[in-house]
């Protein structure tokens, strides 16, 4: 006789169970990813946004400078292949060069370097490959992914404490390629107070979730403007950053106010955070310190990683 009755018991996973599944997925992605030239001990942060014009590149260079100033070696990868701006924002226009290095069977791209405080910035960008910054790169999607892959695999990064990646806006080829090639990346999502920007930025968070990437937090840029008389204005609305952070379950890392000095610093290649003058500089420094503190805490937990992996495996197997 055939089957006469089938009973299916089902239920919704708890938050802890969903977290365990996501953790396991991240472990699997890391185990299956190919090796890159990015040191395993370096914390990787991709500065992302759902749309352009929210100040993502400005956030990248200021956080990189603030973290380096504390004595860290910070890599900056300009993955905004079409819209590169990092060389100007850091006043590093020199062309990249390739050299033979010991232990490699092919030449490696050598990052351009800049001392910051007691630390060091190591920077690569397609803007350091073209004749001048006005040259358009008319590349299709596959070429964009290959460029990022080359920056990860063929750059002699050497010693790094952090790698900050300035992502292009949106959720396209570069984002998907990075998730595949460097799955240990944490995302920092930049938005503005405007509800419209927040609704677009949620797509970056959704991409991270579907790619099993962790969102380290949200930064609200262009938060408020204070005039010379001390009155504060919310030119782009309010609450977008906190609303996004709450919606995706990640912390709001900080709010960056609108100051002309931020734009001036980007134009002249001197990140405002290094001036230590103004509320924007203080906000960038505070966010950088928060990232450093979290990284130290994460490193303290490395010794427990094997035990945590076993716990995750047991939890996932019990759901099967």
For the regions a protein language model found, what residue spans apply to each?
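C-terminal boundary of histidine-terminating zinc-finger modules
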Residues: 268-280
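Walker A/P-loop phosphate-binding motif and the immediately C-terminal alpha-helix
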Residues: 43-81, 201, 205
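Residue-level signature of catalytic and energy-coupling elements of molecular machines
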Residues: 41, 52, 78, 86, ...
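Conserved catalytic-core segment of NTP-binding enzymes
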Residues: 154-157, 161-268
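Helical mechanochemical/support elements of P-loop NTPase systems and associated helical scaffolds
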Residues: 37-40, 59, 63, 81-82, ...
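C-terminal accessory "lid"/substrate-recognition subdomains
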Residues: 234-260, 277-282, 286-320
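Phosphate-binding loop that captures ATP/GTP phosphates
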Residues: 67-133, 138, 145, 152
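Extreme N-terminal, non-catalytic leader segments
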Residues: 1-49, 95, 288, 295, ...
């Amino acid at each position: 006789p055939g089957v006469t009755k089938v009973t299916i018991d089902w239920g919704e996973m708890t938050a802890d169970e969903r977290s365990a599944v996501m953790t396991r997925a991240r472990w699997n992605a890391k185990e299956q990813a190919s090796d890159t030239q990015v040191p395993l001990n370096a914390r990787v942060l991709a500065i992302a946004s759902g749309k352009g014009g929210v100040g993502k590149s400005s956030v990248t260079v200021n956080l990189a400078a603030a973290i380096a100033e504390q004595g860290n070696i910070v890599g900056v990868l300009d993955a905004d292949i079409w819209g590169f701006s990092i060389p100007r924002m850091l006043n590093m226009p020199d062309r990249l060069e390739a050299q033979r290095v010991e232990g490699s069977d092919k030449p490696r791209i050598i990052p351009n370097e800049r001392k910051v405080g007691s630390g060091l910035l190591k920077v690569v960008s397609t803007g350091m490959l073209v004749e001048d910054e006005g040259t358009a790169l008319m590349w299709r999607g596959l070429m964009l992914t290959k460029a990022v892959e080359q920056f990860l695999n063929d750059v002699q990064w050497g010693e790094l404490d952090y790698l900050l990646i300035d992502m292009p806006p949106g959720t396209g080829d570069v984002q998907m390629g990075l998730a595949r090639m460097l799955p240990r990346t944490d995302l920092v999502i930049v938005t503005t107070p405007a509800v419209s920007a927040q609704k677009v930025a949620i797509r970056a968070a959704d991409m991270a979730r579907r790619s099993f990437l962790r969102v380290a937090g949200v930064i609200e840029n262009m938060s408020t403007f204070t005039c010379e008389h001390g009155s504060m204005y919310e030119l782009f609305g309010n609450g977008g950053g906190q609303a996004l952070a709450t919606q995706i379950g990640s912390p709001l890392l900080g709010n960056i106010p609108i100051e002309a000095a931020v734009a001036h610093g980007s134009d002249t290649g001197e990140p405002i955070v290094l001036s230590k003058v103004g509320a924007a500089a203080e906000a960038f420094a505070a966010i950088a310190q928060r990232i450093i503190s979290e990284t130290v805490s994460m490193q303290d937990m490395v010794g427990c990683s094997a035990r945590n992996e076993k716990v995750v495996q047991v939890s996932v197997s019990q759901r099967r």
